[in-house]
């Protein structure tokens, strides 16, 4: 269900520390390195985006920086996203992604910008407001989850 977290390995010996990344890139509010079983290191970044194209610029700078070459995939999210909550990260990823617009490839590495887009970035529609379930609704869903989705 929506409460389950993905299991990840924590062997980040080749990867830079979040502190080092945040020192080099001041616009990064939080970051987390995931070592997936496929041995592809993924960096989740909560980016304080204040200008058009900032997500793309961050990704390009990150992928060009030799100190971070152990990270094969970088995903830039909005600064308010709790990167510790994998369910929320995946929800943001799949709902904000436009593969034609948001994928950047560099030397076998991938950057994905799923930050909110500004009109200057070619996004002409209104970006939808975020909604948050009340604690009452969450409790109701939790009570019915096993009835709705048999595991």
PLM regions: where:
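Charged, compositionally biased interaction regions
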Residues: 1-151
